[in-house]
A protein has these predicted regions:
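Sec-dependent N-terminal signal peptides
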Residues: 3-13
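Short, surface-exposed coil-to-beta transition loops
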Residues: 85-88, 102-103, 112-117, 164-168, ...
């Protein structure tokens, strides 16, 4: 009985230590390095978190005179409209052998959206992400976002792939199931090529398994931002 009691105390101590080490999303946001949001100082970051329960979002004036809006905040997810042209998402991803890590997606919306994805410890130490997409980097996944339809000739497909290079990738995080959706966008496409581009686009969904993102769903992608294909 004494041994069981000691084991119970050790377990409680371990759990308390883990709970103490784990950081809230608010703490992670406040401790994020300044260069990720240069037009939000610490006071503005703190002010952004003061969202009344009665509203779905909170907006503040940033240091550039624009508006920054907190769209979503949960225990493990945060989405912020930094400006009209930029968004930032933070998602805490569980790991098997350590604390949850931070997945950060920064999306810039010019003529077409483009995302960069970074991974960090909860102390904001960057993690090598060259193998976190099925053992590959995000850029290595580009070729998997295009597919040749049966009715399209090989020559036409290769022509479109050449025109499509370089490709812009938009990444969307889902806090509900720890997934990331990759959507391809061309830097430029003519009206003549638009319909064929719709035919070769793929939207791929990846689910976090505790170590990396792995493919789970493949969908043909209709990019509304390219306009009608009629």
């Amino acid at each position: 009985m004494r041994i069981l009691f000691i084991a119970f105390l050790l377990l409680c101590s371990t759990l308390s230590h883990i709970a103490a080490d784990a950081k809230s999303m608010q703490e992670i946001w406040m401790n994020m390095p300044q260069h990720f949001t240069p037009y939000l100082n610490q006071d503005l970051r703190s002010k952004l978190l003061l969202k009344p329960d009665s509203v779905s979002h909170n907006s503040i004036n940033n240091l550039l005179g624009g508006t920054t809006t907190l769209d979503s905040l949960t225990t493990h997810y945060m989405h912020i409209q930094l400006s009209k042209a930029a968004t930032l998402s933070l998602l805490l991803l569980p790991t098997a052998d350590s604390d949850s890590i931070i997945c950060m997606v920064q999306t810039y919306k010019g003529d077409q959206p483009e995302s960069t994805v970074s991974f960090f410890t909860q102390e904001w130490q960057e993690i090598d992400n060259q193998q976190l997409w099925e053992g590959k980097s995000l850029q290595d996944m580009q070729h998997e976002l295009l597919v040749k339809p049966k009715e399209m000739s090989e020559a036409r497909f290769k022509q479109l792939v050449a025109i499509f290079n370089p490709m812009l990738i938009e990444v969307t995080l889902s806090p509900n199931d720890n997934t990331a959706t990759l959507s391809p966008h061309p830097m430029f496409v003519t009206e003549e090529d638009k319909k064929d581009f719709h035919a070769i686009f793929l939207q791929r969904k990846f689910k976090w398994d505790g170590k990396m993102f792995k493919k789970v769903i493949i969908n043909h992608f209709t990019n509304k931002s390219l306009g009608s294909t009629k």
